[in-house]
Amino acid sequence: MTQQIKYKRVLLKLSGESLMGSDPFGINHDTIVQTVGEIAEIVKMGVQVGIVVGGGNIFRGVSAQAGSMDRATADYMGMMATVMNALALKDAFETLGIKARVQSALSMQQIAETYARPKAIQYLEEGKVVIFAAGTGNPFFTTDTAAALRGAEMNCDVMLKATNVDGVYTADPKKDPSATRYETITFDEALNKNLKVMDATAFALCRERKLNIVVFGIAKQGSLKRVITGEDEGTLVHC
């Protein structure tokens, strides 16, 4: 029996840290295999998937800027870290027989295509996974903002923000055991309650473009598929 798909085209935001697993930094082999396996499952269901990946497992521009490094330089280094993660994801997809393409917002023609919206949309329509690397290509913008931007440009049905927590809570569940998860919440409610769904620029862009967000825990087996089929998984932030 074919399962009903709630979202046909999605933009998945993966943090670099989500690829570390239990390691202190870098890419954990078992973790990336599990993550890519979860994504491959929805690709085989016919879902078109674009991915924006962070680079915090390799280099965090904001942290470096707290020292003596110039912020723009640190951000460019962070962008290059996202390219490394994107290439690792592409390789993992192709190992599973899933066609994937890396498009970089910075020109790196020897290792990745330069971002081009029409080509990216074509790839999605062909069933290929498109991995968007190097953020927006500009310093001072987070990969959350890059995800919101690419999600809007690709005309995605939803933005899926994969985190280490299985949704948006009334308080930090690690600090407050009485915290409860929101099943759904509006953009305005999230703002009024000062819930940190993502950075303000990304949140504002999603709200303006009416691009709903689902926050969910990627490490929870089957969670991505449950989001796609409309089950109670994570938190839906909507207009």
Curated annotation (Swiss-Prot):
GO terms for molecular function: ATP binding; UMP kinase activity. Pathway: Pyrimidine metabolism; CTP biosynthesis via de novo pathway; UDP from UMP (UMPK route): step 1/1. It is found in: Cytoplasm. It is an enzyme of class 2 (transferase). Its EC number is 2.7.4.22. GO terms for biological process: 'de novo' CTP biosynthetic process; UDP biosynthetic process. InterPro entries: AceGlu_kinase-like_sf, Asp/Glu/Uridylate_kinase, Uridylate_kinase, Uridylate_kinase_bac. It comes from the Bacteria. Keywords: ATP-binding, Cytoplasm, Kinase, Nucleotide-binding, Pyrimidine biosynthesis, Transferase. Catalyzes the reversible phosphorylation of UMP to UDP. This is Uridylate kinase. It comes from Neisseria gonorrhoeae (strain ATCC 700825 / FA 1090). The gene is pyrH.
